[in-house]
Amino acid sequence: MPGMLLVLLVTLSLYLVTMPQTITLEDAGLFQMICHKGGIGHPPGYPLFILSCQAFVNLPVFEQDVVAGNLMSALFASAACSVLLIVLRQLQVTGLLSVSLALVYGLSATFWSQAIIVEVYSLAVLLFLICLSLSLAYRDSEQVKYLLWLALVYGLALSNHWPLQGLGTPALLAILAPKARLIVRFLLVPANFLAI
């Protein structure tokens, strides 16, 4: 999709140009330290983010250690904006409007400020939007593969930032509610197998 590529490149380019080259405020110092030296973040610990960051900053391509963590957040944020475009198209928002909305979200002050520092929110948004997209795909197609992928990504999202994922759960349930009978029937098959 050319729109996705445009959103990805525009947001990532702007994030890279404005990304700090040093440690910033909030939790960035803590996350920089943990990503480079190991450890556990403040509660709830953010295990998915920490493990991803540790792997990313240890790639042998970075000259400045601080930039690696910030870059990872920028990549997650740009990917989130691209997935938002997919969600908008699933909701029948097409053309220039969907691209514009994804760009406006990616360039909003709050999102941008978190996208350019090493912080858990860009990954949380990315995972939530993937969950939203998978829920919409399941609603539209009733293919079980979307439900299975949703379960996996939802679990990963909980291990990244459970409070934010919990806040978004009612939206996912509202989308899936009309398909509740199919979902229960799907879940009963393994439950019956385990009962044996």
Question: What spans do the regions from the language model cover?
Answer:
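Transmembrane signal-anchor helices characteristic of membrane glycosylation enzymes that use polyprenol
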Residues: 1-25, 195-196
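Transmembrane-helix signature of polytopic, membrane-embedded enzymes
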Residues: 2-6, 84-107, 125-126, 145, ...
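Transmembrane-helix motifs of polytopic, lipid-linked glycan transferases
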Residues: 5, 9, 71-92, 130-134
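Membrane-interface alpha helices of multi-pass inner-membrane proteins
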Residues: 34-37, 101-103, 146-160, 172-174
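Short hydrophobic/aromatic helix or loop-helix immediately within or flanking a transmembrane segment
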Residues: 35-63, 74-75
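Membrane-interface transmembrane helices that cradle and orient dolichyl/undecaprenyl
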Residues: 89-92, 115, 131-147, 154-157, ...
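Short acidic/glycine- and proline-prone juxtamembrane loop motifs at membrane-interface regions
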Residues: 110-121
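Perimembrane helix-loop-helix junctions
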Residues: 167-196
